[in-house]
């Protein structure tokens, strides 16, 4: 274990980044409410001397850290942007101006111009929404259990599409677009499967986040939208919802391989530069 680690203590997940003995970038992930596991992991790696920490739960985690650690604090978006720029270079993307949409517990959206960034806005709709509605509607409360079900679920029995409204009449927009998320639930009597409900929840979140990102991109005439966040990790269905809607509006979606670890990567790089 190297002497320095970067920690992104988010609302739902805490991510840790470090370089292992082979100098390879390595990650650990914990639920943020399981702080004892995070502390135990740090204590069990005796070589750690310096910790750069960011994220909404960083203060709380710092209070639990005992020992002779050098603690460096870094603002959340400064860490995230540094991590994103590192990954972009690693993946050989040459993009200077883009919208950065970070889908965490909620969603934050920034304009990025070279090294400068401005917060465009955000929404409370995000990964926390997926998990909250999943728990309320299906009693499934682990992200790892939700994702496989969204792959086999269908939104056809719950969402109202433009085509449903117009029937056989020519509509002014694509018939496949969603007119109302969960709209059919109020007008039909059916026992929907957990997989259909979860697929529809994820559709709602994906479309809300994408629509907001597209509005900001259109306002500033920006082509590329980079979507990051742990909510996208191994979540092929959500990525498909976001990418298809983004491309439909003639923008270019980009998903980074380790985008969910951007904050932890940025914190690590800040402490080791």
From Swiss-Prot:
<dbReference type="Pfam" id="PF03630">
    <property type="entry name" value="Fumble"/>
</dbReference>
<feature type="binding site">
    <location>
        <position position="230"/>
    </location>
    <ligand>
        <name>ATP</name>
    </ligand>
</feature>
<keyword id="KW-0808">Transferase</keyword>
<dbReference type="GO" id="GO:0015937">
    <property type="term" value="P:coenzyme A biosynthetic process"/>
</dbReference>
<comment type="pathway">
    <text>Cofactor biosynthesis; coenzyme A biosynthesis; CoA from (R)-pantothenate: step 1/5.</text>
</comment>
<comment type="function">
    <text>Catalyzes the phosphorylation of pantothenate (Pan), the first step in CoA biosynthesis.</text>
</comment>
<keyword id="KW-0418">Kinase</keyword>
<protein>
    <recommendedName>
        <fullName>Type II pantothenate kinase</fullName>
        <ecNumber>2.7.1.33</ecNumber>
    </recommendedName>
</protein>
<comment type="subunit">
    <text>Homodimer.</text>
</comment>
<dbReference type="GO" id="GO:0004594">
    <property type="term" value="F:pantothenate kinase activity"/>
</dbReference>
<keyword id="KW-0547">Nucleotide-binding</keyword>
<feature type="binding site">
    <location>
        <begin position="8"/>
        <end position="15"/>
    </location>
    <ligand>
        <name>ATP</name>
    </ligand>
</feature>
<dbReference type="InterPro" id="IPR011602">
    <property type="entry name" value="Type_II_PanK_bac"/>
</dbReference>
<dbReference type="GO" id="GO:0005829">
    <property type="term" value="C:cytosol"/>
</dbReference>
<feature type="binding site">
    <location>
        <position position="105"/>
    </location>
    <ligand>
        <name>ATP</name>
    </ligand>
</feature>
<feature type="binding site">
    <location>
        <begin position="127"/>
        <end position="131"/>
    </location>
    <ligand>
        <name>ATP</name>
    </ligand>
</feature>
<dbReference type="GO" id="GO:0005524">
    <property type="term" value="F:ATP binding"/>
</dbReference>
<keyword id="KW-0067">ATP-binding</keyword>
<feature type="active site" description="Proton acceptor">
    <location>
        <position position="76"/>
    </location>
</feature>
<keyword id="KW-0963">Cytoplasm</keyword>
<comment type="similarity">
    <text>Belongs to the type II pantothenate kinase family.</text>
</comment>
<feature type="binding site">
    <location>
        <position position="143"/>
    </location>
    <ligand>
        <name>ATP</name>
    </ligand>
</feature>
<dbReference type="InterPro" id="IPR043129">
    <property type="entry name" value="ATPase_NBD"/>
</dbReference>
<keyword id="KW-0173">Coenzyme A biosynthesis</keyword>
<dbReference type="InterPro" id="IPR004567">
    <property type="entry name" value="Type_II_PanK"/>
</dbReference>
């Amino acid at each position: 274990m190297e002497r320095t680690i970067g920690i992104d203590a988010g609302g739902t997940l805490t991510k840790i980044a470090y370089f292992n003995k082979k100098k390879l970038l390595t990650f650990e992930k914990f639920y943020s409410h399981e702080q004892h596991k995070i502390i135990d992991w740090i204590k069990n790696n005796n070589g750690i001397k310096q910790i750069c920490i960011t994220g909404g739960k960083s203060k709380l985690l710092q209070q639990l850290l005992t020992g002779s650690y050098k603690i460096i604090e870094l603002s959340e978006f400064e860490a995230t942007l540094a991590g994103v720029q590192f990954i972009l270079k690693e993946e050989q993307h040459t993009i200077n101006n883009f919208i950065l949409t970070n889908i965490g517990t909620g969603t934050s959206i920034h304009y990025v111009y070279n090294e400068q960034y401005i917060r465009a806005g955000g929404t409370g709709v995000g990964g926390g929404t997926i998990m909250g509605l999943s728990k309320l509607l299906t009693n499934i409360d682990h992200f790892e259990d939700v994702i496989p079900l969204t792959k086999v679920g269908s939104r056809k029995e719950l969402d109202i599409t433009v085509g449903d409204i117009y029937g056989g009449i020519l509509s002014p927009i694509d018939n496949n677009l969603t007119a109302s998320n969960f709209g059919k639930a109020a007008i039909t009597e059916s026992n929907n499967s957990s997989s259909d409900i979860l697929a529809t929840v994820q559709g709602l979140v994906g479309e809300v986040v994408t629509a907001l990102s597209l509005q900001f991109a259109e306002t500033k005439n920006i082509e590329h939208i980079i979507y990051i966040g742990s909510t996208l990790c191994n979540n092929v269905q959500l990525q498909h919802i976001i990418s298809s809607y983004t491309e439909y509006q003639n923008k270019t979606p980009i998903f980074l391989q380790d985008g969910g670890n951007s904050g932890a990567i940025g914190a690590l790089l800040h402490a080791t530069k």
